[in-house]
């Protein structure tokens, strides 16, 4: 039985907060616990901190792949960003200021608390980290925002609460300061019931992530605030600290999400039934699920990117989609469920002694209004099948049955050691240390079961900086698929042109050949693959038309209307330059 940090929202002390710096909501309800009690009792202060965790700690990114090239849209439900019809009202994250106010209240009172200095330091360090996290979530999406570092007092004069936007560079400077201040206060690690809290290693890893993001082409270093050298130094420091703490790549790759708190885990949201659970129904076939479908069905673009066992690229010109599952690296089998895969990753498969089969016995339309149309095989009874013929395996609770899809309890690993390592390697490449960058790629591939080959290069052919950069882009695509990192990568690398070049995302249609008998539930796909034909199919409702304008989001009109001092981004018709 695992003890986990309980990050459920408090019911006894809930501050009602200011929205977007200027809208006064209900006053704080202190009927159950008075403010003086909060800062005189470490347990209540910790409970107050826990609601910050509840609001800001990321969880399973279920369905997020549908909004990138990782997954295909369910029944051709292409979103407005990919259609090119999104507006500045399409993305509103400004509720984050609610969390910032909660944090600022804590920071404004913690130094006056009457419990031990050691406890005050730990609580303050965590709060500073989360303020940096919250501001990064805003600034990375919109550019500079108003920096509110003290809790504003409720008032009927809203003009006293309205603040202009700070420059992006000013915001990032403050984010980095909060991280540095947090790092000084946080312990090297938490233990026992506190495992899962933010510690020094998490803060250092996050600093590396932040600097990498703003050093990348989208923000291009912000005039020296986030240079590649600074990003390299931060990620190198994080890597060395984690190395000293015994962190590292965990093998096998397929067990990272099953073996909780393994050495690869850096930042984690802990789940356990019944205290803290999430719904995974939309991720798995309806035959073994209920109530939802269509999340994170892997795209053919993702499937094709996984390397072969010898490290070479999978190329459609020289290989057949009929045998796309032959001799791939270990990450392919740990992430991708394909027609007849022998990985019984669901309890329902094991109970019914079957594999998942995605083939059709007849197909009437390869490109219907909602996708593939025809008669699905009767072994896997899935009336709402995957449009790509693939399913996601990563971060699935393998212990629950159809009736328990609301009770999934797999920990969500937000930062893995592999990310810190690859952030370090990418920064090494950008600062001219190509040897270190290549060494990191080799480590990542070695853990994935890729063979070193005679030359010991694990199939990596890149030598020069531009080619190594492309190698990192491909490697991150497969290493971190369905972990909520892809859109951030596409934005910071300014790769929307690549998305448009796809025309559409794709899948495959697997059809049983005429005259061939159905397979048995546990037939060996390696011997029956030639009973099927495979056809590449488009999966979007329209061609991808995502605009470069979307690299940085516009400020929603409702937010602008509440504060006349806010200016719209210049890529959305305003005067504010989010790149400064």
Each language-model region and where it sits:
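Bacterial Sec-dependent N-terminal signal peptides
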Residues: 2-5, 14-41, 175, 208, ...
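An aromatic- and glycine-enriched ligand-binding surface/loop that stacks and positions planar moieties
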Residues: 22-77, 149, 180-181, 197-371, ...
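Active/binding-pocket-proximal capping segment
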Residues: 420-424, 431-454
């Amino acid at each position: 039985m695992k003890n986990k940090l309980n990050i459920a929202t408090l019911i006894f002390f809930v501050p009602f907060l200011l929205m977007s710096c200027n809208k006064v909501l209900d006053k704080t309800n202190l009927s159950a616990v008075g403010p003086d009690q909060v800062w005189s009792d470490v347990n209540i202060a910790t409970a107050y901190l826990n609601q910050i965790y509840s609001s800001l700690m990321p969880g399973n990114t279920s369905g997020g792949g549908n909004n990138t090239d990782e997954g295909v849209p369910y029944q051709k439900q292409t979103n407005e960003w990919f259609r090119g019809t999104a507006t500045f009202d399409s993305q509103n994250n400004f509720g984050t200021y609610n969390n910032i106010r909660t944090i600022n209240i804590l920071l404004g009172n913690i130094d006056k608390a009457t419990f031990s200095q050691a406890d005050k330091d730990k609580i303050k360090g965590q709060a500073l980290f989360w303020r940096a996290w919250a501001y990064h979530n805003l600034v990375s999406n919109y550019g500079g925002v108003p920096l509110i570092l003290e809790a504003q007092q409720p008032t009927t004069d809203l003009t006293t609460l309205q603040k202009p936007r700070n420059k992006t560079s000013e915001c990032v400077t403050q984010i980095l300061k909060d991280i540095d201040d947090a790092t000084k206060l946080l312990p090297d690690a938490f233990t026992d019931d506190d495992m899962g809290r933010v510690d020094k290693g998490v803060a250092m890893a996050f600093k590396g992530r932040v600097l990498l993001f703003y050093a990348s082409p989208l923000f291009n270093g912000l005039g020296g605030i986030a240079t590649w050298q600074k990003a390299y130094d931060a990620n190198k420091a994080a890597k060395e600290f984690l190395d000293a703490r015994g962190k590292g790549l965990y093998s096998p790759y397929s067990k990272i999400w099953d073996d909780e708190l393994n050495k690869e885990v850096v930042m984690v949201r802990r789940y356990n039934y019944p205290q803290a659970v999430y719904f995974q129904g939309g991720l798995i076939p309806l035959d073994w699920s209920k109530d939802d479908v269509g999340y994170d069905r892997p795209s053919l673009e993702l499937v094709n990117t996984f390397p072969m066992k010898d490290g070479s690229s999978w190329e459609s010109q020289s290989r057949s989609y009929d045998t796309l599952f032959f001799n791939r690296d270990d990450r392919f089998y740990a992430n991708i469920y394909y027609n007849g895969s022998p990985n019984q990753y669901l309890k329902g498969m094991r109970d019914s002694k079957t594999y998942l089969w995605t083939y059709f016995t007849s197909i009437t339309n390869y490109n219907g209004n909602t996708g593939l149309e025809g008669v699905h095989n009767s072994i896997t009874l899935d009336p709402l099948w995957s449009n790509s013929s693939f399913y996601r395996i990563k971060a699935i609770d393998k212990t629950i049955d159809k009736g328990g899809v609301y009770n999934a309890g797999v920990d969500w690993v937000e930062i893995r050691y592999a990310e810190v390592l690859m952030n370090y390697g990418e920064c090494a490449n950008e600062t001219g240390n190509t040897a270190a960058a290549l060494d990191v790629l080799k480590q990542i591939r070695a853990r994935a079961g890729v063979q070193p080959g005679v030359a010991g290069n694990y199939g990596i052919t890149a030598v020069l900086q531009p080619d190594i950069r492309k190698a990192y882009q491909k490697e991150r695509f497969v290493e971190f698929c369905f972990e909520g990192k892809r859109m951030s990568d596409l934005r910071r690398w300014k790769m929307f042109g690549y998305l448009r070049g796809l025309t559409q995302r794709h899948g495959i249609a697997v059809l049983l050949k005429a005259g061939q008998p159905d397979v048995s539930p546990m037939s060996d796909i390696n011997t029956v693959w030639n009973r099927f034909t495979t056809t590449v199919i488009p999966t979007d409702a329209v061609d991808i038309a995502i605009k470069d304008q979307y690299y940085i989001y516009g400020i929603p009109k409702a937010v602008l209307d509440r504060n006349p001092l806010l200016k719209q981004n210049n890529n959305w018709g305003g005067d504010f330059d989010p790149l400064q």
